[in-house]
């Protein structure tokens, strides 16, 4: 079974551990299980509303038949109660996906369908997006969130990012560090720093067709945020900001409550509903684990709740290992859209040499497809994209929401290949990634239309590519293919392949 522990882990940001059920401790869900008779199970919950999140504990083992009993363990309030109820209450659904292959787990819509139908009448303002941001530069220590000589969120720097986004068909620019007061973490959500002219920025962005993506870091101070939340959303609505990333960095909410407690669940729901009233989409960081609420409130576009790419910038243990991203689709990915923030083109951090990105460049491109998020960030500093325009062309063209998904091959912890079809042009995009070992991917194209020819643009590891010794080595090639073809491609250690397949129009 693959799971992450509850104790000692903040915001679900941990590496998934592979253990037998009998050796598994108190863990968060989803828990993914491979049985001895080659079935795949995933235990989670759906429609978590005004309740505490479910964790699992093994409580009994019968040695004779190797039976292990798992029991639900709810995240408590600081006072010890699990759930506070004054009237009747409907508990969340307890879910189990049962699949005959690892890939079939990824195609289940069970959790989503157990949530209530959409409550937003007009959803035309809710749109998927590729975006960049003033963010990775902080992790590289090139800029600061707080005001000063190296402040990142300035008018000029934001406009420079808007220019890059406009030139590369990217929909938005996330700006963190725009508001007072990052020096003390007593945040205002309506007062920009003096060097951040939001009127000028949003006017400029509109002229270029690029949105400003807002940011509300709360530091876990829920009371301060709820006192300002309506004004903060009104402020953004006034300037035409329709996407906001929220953050809750801090071990506890209001200094005492767990993020996944009933207190946290109620707060996050309040934020999502308030945002919807102001036509604002939410990217929720440090969340309670997703359970399908995006069906009811589709303005909940994506959430973190994962040990993402940022850990490669500063983790004292060295960063995410190669196997991490070939486990995530079968675990955290089953809970819903995941803001992992991929597409890092520079693999080291000069000020923290003990850590690095443990992938090849081709794998970074493939992650844009493999890890689903309708709001999908290309996280690196734009200078690194400007230095590598040809690989970045894959990101420029790649959608972030899809009409169909297939999984040609998958083995949890070793490799996964996911193909997704766009919602208009009939183009397919493939992301194929591997873990610790070099391998040869055999990607059947049988999902393509049988009566069409396709131009395949393939971004793959060069022969010398290796995530440790030569991560940036990449080859880009084109070939004509049909549904009867199979792509046979070598992948380096922690390598990958990204493919764009577009129908060839007869002249």
Give residue ranges: language-model regions.
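N-terminal accessory beta-strand-rich subdomains and adjacent acidic, glycine-rich linkers
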Residues: 1-119
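An acidic-aromatic substrate-binding cleft motif
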Residues: 86-168, 172
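Catalytic cores of secreted or luminal carbohydrate-active enzymes
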Residues: 362-408
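Conserved, mostly hydrophobic/aromatic
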Residues: 165, 282, 370, 430, ...
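Carbohydrate-binding surface patches
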Residues: 412-454, 497-500
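Aromatic- and carboxylate-enriched substrate-binding clefts and catalytic-loop regions
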Residues: 176-360
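C-terminal beta-strand-rich structural cap/linker in extracellular carbohydrate-active enzymes
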Residues: 478-507
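Solvent-exposed beta-strand/loop surfaces of large extracellular or lumenal domains
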Residues: 7, 458-484
């Amino acid at each position: 079974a693959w799971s992450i522990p509850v104790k000692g882990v903040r915001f679900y940001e941990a590496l998934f551990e592979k253990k037998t059920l009998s050796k598994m401790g108190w863990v968060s869900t989803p828990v993914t299980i491979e049985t001895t008779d080659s079935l795949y199970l995933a235990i989670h919950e759906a429609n978590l509303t005004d309740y505490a999140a479910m964790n699992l504990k093994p409580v009994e083992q019968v040695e004779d038949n190797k039976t292990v009993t798992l029991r639900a363990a709810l995240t408590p309030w600081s006072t010890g109660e699990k759930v506070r109820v004054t009237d009747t209450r409907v508990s969340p659904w307890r879910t189990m996906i049962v699949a005959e292959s690892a890939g079939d787990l990824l195609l289940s819509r069970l959790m989503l369908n157990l949530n209530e139908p959409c409550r937003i009448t007009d959803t035309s303002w809710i749109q998927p997006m590729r975006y960049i941001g003033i963010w990775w530069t902080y992790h590289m220590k090139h800029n600061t969130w707080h005001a000063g000589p190296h402040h990142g969120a300035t008018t000029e720097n934001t406009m420079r990012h808007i220019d890059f986004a406009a030139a590369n068909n990217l929909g938005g620019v996330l700006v963190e560090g725009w508001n007072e007061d990052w020096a003390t973490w007593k945040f205002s959500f309506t007062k920009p720093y003096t060097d951040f002219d939001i009127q000028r920025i949003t006017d400029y962005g509109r002229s270029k067709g690029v949105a400003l993506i807002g940011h509300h870091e709360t530091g876990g101070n829920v009371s301060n945020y709820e006192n300002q939340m309506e004004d903060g959303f009104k402020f953004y609505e006034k300037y035409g900001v329709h996407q906001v990333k929220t953050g809750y960095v801090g071990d506890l909410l209001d200094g005492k409550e767990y993020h996944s407690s009933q207190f946290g669940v109620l707060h996050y729901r309040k934020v999502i509903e308030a945002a919807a009233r102001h036509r604002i989409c939410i990217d929720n960081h440090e969340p309670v684990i997703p359970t399908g609420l995006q069906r009811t409130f589709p303005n909940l576009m994506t959430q973190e709740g994962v040990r993402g790419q940022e850990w490669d910038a500063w983790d004292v243990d060295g960063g995410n290992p190669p196997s991490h991203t070939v486990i995530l689709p079968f675990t955290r990915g089953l809970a819903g859209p995941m803001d992992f923030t991929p597409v890092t083109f520079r693999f080291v951090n000069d000020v923290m040499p003990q850590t690095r990105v443990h992938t090849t460049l081709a794998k970074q491109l493939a992650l844009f497809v493999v890890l689903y998020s309708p709001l999908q960030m290309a996280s690196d500093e734009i200078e690194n994209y400007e230095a590598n325009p040809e690989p970045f062309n894959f990101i420029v063209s790649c959608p972030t929401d899809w009409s169909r998904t297939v999984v040609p091959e998958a083995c949890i912890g070793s490799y996964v290949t996911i193909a997704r079809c766009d919602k208009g042009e009939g183009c397919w995009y493939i992301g194929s990634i591997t873990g610790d070992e070099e391998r040869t991917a055999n990607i059947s194209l049988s999902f393509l239309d049988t009566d069409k020819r396709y131009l395949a643009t393939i971004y793959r590891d060069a022969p010398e590519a290796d995530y440790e010794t030569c991560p940036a080595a990449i080859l880009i090639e084109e070939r004509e293919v049909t549904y009867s073809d199979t792509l046979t491609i070598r992948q380096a250690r922690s390598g990958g392949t990204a493919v764009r397949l577009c129908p060839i129009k007869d002249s």
